[in-house]
């Protein structure tokens, strides 16, 4: 049975998703990575003459959701049955995209019919890549030529939808934004580079920089449309059978997901990282092995998209004057900048005392 990796290509109108789906699929197959694509469902509904106008917005998006869900379940089954170690499911939009077009209550109603909710869906995909609409940075290329069903007839409306889509996906475990700072061919190559890095080719590297900042304005963070708070509990264990690893609960209650992570240090900012989802029962079982737990930490993580860059800002219950913010990079010398609203104290990437394990051992409580 193959391990299935679910990757969503999303974004605003005329961002290049359809072309990107074909391009990434071809390139992954060149790398001998079995890939199954799922094309955009909305265009198929519209082609059949079904629209929000003649069906009503709720009924249209409910049917769209059910169509997507059925196809996703079927393609997931097929991917699992493939005779390979890992298979990629590549989506032109995921189940959560329709949330950008309906109210919170409407989405909760039709997702709830299948025992799903926003948080569970957001965490069900392994990576999400947002292709920014050409209406933001490549305005001369915006139009209906590539999609006769495109409904956003102004640049302003297209940018608004782009932000709405980005907002619903903010908080997913791995989100990257591909902007229009280059021509389209290079945009696709930048996307491929991000996808390949996520898949761990040639190695599953994590390159992060971490910064100590002054305690943020929480009210301001909550006002940012592309910001989402995720409660996190993580524990560090060293067991006789599995050695050193980390387990993490991301979210709360029945909306939580559980992840096991093994990291191998390469340099101060570069590590090999191997992550796998685990069940709540596995998480609880690990946590019950108190003799092997070396530290536990709880924090609120604010996932933020600012200036087309994804940041993770962590607020800890034991600090009232400071916090940390991290950014993940593709290379050690990649240029970066921090959001203008954070007040930098200093970079602490290379300071052992600010690693999560050290904080867990100093401040954490079981």
Question: Which residues make up each language-model segment?
Answer:
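NTP-dependent small-molecule kinase module
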Residues: 2, 157, 163-212
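Conserved lysine of the Walker
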Residues: 17
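Hydrophobic positions on the alpha1 helix immediately C-terminal to the Walker A/P-loop
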Residues: 20
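ATP-dependent NMP and nucleoside kinases share a basic, alpha-helical "lid"
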Residues: 91-155, 159
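Phosphate-end processing signature that detects enzymes handling 5′-triphosphorylated RNA
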Residues: 185-186, 192-366
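Conserved substrate/cofactor phosphate-moiety recognition/catalytic segment
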Residues: 25-67
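Conserved nucleotide-sensing/catalytic segment adjacent to the nucleotide-binding pocket
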Residues: 50-109
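Hydrophobic anchor at the beta1->P-loop junction of P-loop NTPases
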Residues: 9
